């Protein structure tokens, strides 16, 4: 199975690296086109477009200016270690071993507004450009139009390379909208994580993001290859609820956290 996750806004380029293996991102020619557009933006443009503070806008204007076509361990780091945030807190990539990284390299992909699709060990320079950003570009008025079929085609290549036709969608709606499911050569299965709150089970964003990361780790660590085995996921108290699940949506619940 191939796992797809969202990226994170929070980045870490400081922590010691737990692996020195790296690969090069494959869609840099596209990233370059977006960087050229982003370099025309003023800090005020960035603040308004991304709905961020002046400080974050300044930081990202600087990142766009400093971005280089050459990706090296000096100006970039592996995507799976650079992304932080709730999904990556659940994934805990910094405690994976070399065999796990090799497995993830084949079975995990990260969607990205700037890089399109990243393998875990692909070098990534720091950026902020969410997929939902309404950035006018040579191909349209937003990033969904910019990426078109490119991400889906890359996913199809990865699906063939890893050996079956199952894609586990652990990405947010904002990011999975960049994928065209009808053009995917795969059965898409979306796990849903619901937490109890005041007697009701619902998707709580913070918990759901972390759970998506935990499930990605569960698949990687246990080399899960069947959907039946995926339903055994029980990290952090989640359990599979068969009667609420369908062939394409797996529902997991958890009792209230105190």
UniProtKB/Swiss-Prot annotation:
Pfam families: H2O2_YaaD. InterPro entries: YaaA. Transmembrane segments: none annotated. GO terms for cellular component: cytosol. One of its GO terms (biological process) is response to hydroperoxide. Belongs to the UPF0246 family. PANTHER family: PEROXIDE STRESS RESISTANCE PROTEIN YAAA, PEROXIDE STRESS RESPONSE PROTEIN YAAA. This is UPF0246 protein VV1_0535. It comes from Vibrio vulnificus (strain CMCP6).
């Amino acid at each position: 199975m191939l796992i797809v996750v969202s990226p994170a806004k929070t980045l870490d380029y400081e922590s010691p690296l737990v692996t020195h293996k790296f690969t090069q991102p494959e869609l840099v020619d596209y990233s370059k086109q977006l960087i050229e557009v982003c370099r025309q933006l003023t800090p005020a443009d960035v603040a308004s477009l991304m709905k961020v503070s002046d400080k974050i806008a300044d930081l990202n204007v600087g990142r766009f200016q400093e971005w280089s076509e050459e990706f090296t361990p000096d100006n970039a780091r592996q995507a799976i270690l650079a992304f932080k945030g709730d999904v990556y807190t659940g994934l805990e990539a910094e405690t994976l071993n070399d065999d796990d990284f090799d497995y993830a390299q084949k079975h995990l992909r990260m969607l990205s507004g700037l890089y399109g699709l990243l393998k875990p060990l692909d070098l990534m320079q720091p950026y902020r450009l969410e997929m939902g950003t309404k950035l006018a570009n040579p191909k349209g008025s937003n990033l969904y139009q910019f990426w078109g079929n490119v991400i889906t085609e890359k996913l199809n290549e990865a699906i063939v390379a890893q050996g079956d036709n199952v894609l586990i969608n652990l990405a947010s709606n904002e990011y999975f909208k960049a994928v065209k499911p009808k053009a995917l050569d795969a059965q898409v299965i979306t796990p849903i994580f619901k937490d109890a709150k005041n007697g009701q089970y619902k998707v709580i964003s913070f918990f759901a993001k972390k759970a998506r990361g935990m499930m990605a780790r569960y698949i990687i660590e246990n080399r899960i290859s069947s959907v039946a085995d995926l339903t055994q996921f029980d990290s952090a108290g989640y359990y599979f609820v068969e009667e609420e699940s369908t062939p394409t949506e797996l529902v997991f619940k958890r009792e209230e956290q105190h």
